[in-house]
Regions:
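Glycine-rich SAM-binding Motif I of class I
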Residues: 89-93
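Conserved SAM-binding motif I beta-strand of class I
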Residues: 102-107
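Class I SAM-dependent transferase core
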Residues: 25-76
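Bacterial N-terminal signal peptides that target proteins for export
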Residues: 2-12
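S-adenosyl-L-methionine
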Residues: 110-143
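Conserved class I S-adenosyl-L-methionine
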Residues: 78-87
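C-terminal substrate-binding/active-site "lid" region of AdoMet-derived donor-dependent transferases
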Residues: 154-211
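C-terminal motif of bacterial Sec signal peptides marking the signal peptidase cleavage site
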Residues: 21-23
Length: 211
């Protein structure tokens, strides 16, 4: 069952008080663990899916959603993917494994960065998939041709000016679950009840979107 944005935010406050971190998991541990068991054997998932990650908790994206996110962006071997909030690395690893493209995963949690790096090695894509421990708001995105996100609505909105400022026109952005306010997506796709939003950075940023 999907939560409304308001109820999801309220739920975050309650859980945040209990575990002492900002943000929350929008699903139970049972659901998160179920998602994890569907992932590629080359990818392991931390036992605690609610491990703190700065502004956003870690909740793994299901494999079928990962696949469609890459499909909707029409990625190819010449692309450079940046996954912001990369968790166990599954999006970057799948992109490298399936399409032969390069990718960088950014996460503030050092344990998840280590796990993702180990997963890339196990999958045999360490030469194309790398992971860095960093605040995503401090990450240089200028080399990206594709950016993937699974954050929160308010984080997407805080990130939007940075995307406009640093990404080249034509760069594709794909977000699992959350939009970017009044920036209308070019496509919206549903996969097993989960929503994927897709944008392309325009040559001219409308004045109404710059703030």
């Amino acid at each position: 069952m999907q939560l409304t944005r308001l109820s999801f935010q309220a739920f975050c406050i309650v859980v945040g008080l209990g575990i002492g971190v900002l943000g929350c998991t929008p699903s139970s541990n049972k659901t998160a663990n179920a998602d994890s068991t569907q992932s590629s054997p080359a990818i392991t998932t931390a036992q605690d899916d609610s491990a703190p990650r700065g502004d956003v908790p870690y909740v793994p994206t299901p494999p079928e959603v990962v696949s469609e996110m890459l499909n909707i962006a029409k990625v190819n071997k010449n692309d450079m993917l940046y996954d912001l909030g990369s968790g166990d690395g599954r999006i970057v690893i799948e992109a490298a494994r399936r399409y032969g493209m390069r990718g960088v995963g950014v996460d503030i949690n050092p344990e998840l960065v280590k796990e993702a790096t180990d997963n890339a090695r196990k999958a045999g894509v360490s030469d194309r998939a790398s992971f860095v421990e960093q605040d995503l708001f401090k990450t240089d995105l200028s080399k990206a041709t594709v950016v993937t996100l699974y954050l929160l609505p308010e984080v997407n909105m805080r990130l939007r000016p940075k995307l406009f400022r640093e990404l080249k026109p034509g760069t594709r952005i794909v977000s699992h679950a959350f939009d970017m306010g009044d920036w209308k997506p070019e496509r919206v796709v549903e996969v097993d009840g989960r929503t994927i939003y897709y944008w392309v950075v325009p040559k001219e940023i409308p004045t109404s979107l710059k703030n």
